[in-house]
């Protein structure tokens, strides 16, 4: 990545050093793989005075493990390619691994990090809706120490997160499912499958003894951030998954969002695609 003129580059060797540098300069930006930041710099959307390169950091910021309670722990500096190819991810959350295969190119996935992907907060991203449907949490380090918050609370708006000055994402935690679940992510693109999604819908659901035991739907790329649709869970859980109920759930998933028209499609087009896609995805994961 080219360093902008007038910008300083620092390479801390530990997390505390990185946090201190970020906290001391409001114009500082962390750099993991640098993929998202490069796009912002190239298009003039960012002009940081200080870049904090996280490349020397080790420990829990890298790698994938499964904790004793079954939670999947993914370090923020883990590349998207590592998430895609991890046997642990494939076993724990196969929908997450599958979604990564449709994200940009292998070359990009070899460089881009999970923490950078989420911290970038571009509404046209694949993984936020998937991780929302999976109930993911993010671990954050900052001047006040460590904290954990739901991914839903991290995402605020267009290229905006709830991170305070000096904070950075250190890991993503995906809880284990209480019952065997199925997941599905469907993206609609204007060109190829590797393109930015015009609409992305993620579904996670389970049926136990003929009734819906788990049901989470999240939608991305249609507003300024990805959204979990809790009304769908309220509608489905405890019910027998009939075609009529699934259609109603899909309509519920598509309602109540402030759709934004852009180069990927009109607001009305996106709402229709969400409804149709959600119905198909729910039918698949709720099928016997």
Predicted regions and their residues:
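C-terminal structural segment of proteins
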Residues: 1-288
């Amino acid at each position: 990545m080219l360093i902008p003129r007038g910008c300083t580059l620092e390479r801390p060797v530990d997390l505390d050093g990185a946090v201190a540098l970020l906290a001391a300069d409001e114009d500082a930006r962390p750099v993991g793989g640098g993929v998202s930041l490069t796009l912002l710099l190239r298009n003039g959307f960012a002009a940081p005075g200080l870049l904090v390169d996280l490349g020397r950091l080790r420990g829990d910021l890298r790698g994938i493990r499964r904790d004793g309670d079954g939670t999947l722990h993914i370090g923020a500096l883990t590349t998207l390619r590592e998430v895609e190819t991890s046997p642990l991810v494939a076993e724990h959350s196969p929908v997450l691994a599958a979604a990564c295969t449709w994200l940009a190119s292998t070359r990009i996935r070899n460089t881009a990090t999970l923490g950078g992907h989420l911290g970038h907060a571009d509404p046209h991203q694949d993984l936020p809706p998937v991780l929302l449907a999976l109930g993911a949490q993010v671990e954050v380090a900052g001047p006040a120490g460590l904290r954990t918050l739901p991914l839903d609370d991290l995402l605020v708006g267009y290229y905006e997160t709830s991170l305070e000055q000096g904070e950075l994402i250190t890991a993503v935690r995906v809880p284990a499912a209480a019952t065997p679940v199925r997941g599905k992510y469907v993206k609609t693109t204007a060109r190829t499958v590797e393109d930015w999604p015009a609409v992305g819908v993620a579904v996670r659901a389970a049926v136990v003894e003929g009734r819906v035991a788990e049901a989470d739907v999240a939608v991305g790329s249609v507003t300024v951030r990805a959204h979990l649709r809790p009304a769908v869970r309220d509608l489905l859980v405890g019910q027998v998954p009939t075609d009529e109920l699934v259609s109603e759930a899909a309509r519920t998933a598509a309602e109540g969002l402030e759709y934004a028209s852009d180069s990927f499609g009109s607001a009305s087009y996106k709402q229709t695609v969400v409804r149709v896609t959600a119905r198909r995805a729910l039918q698949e994961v709720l099928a016997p």
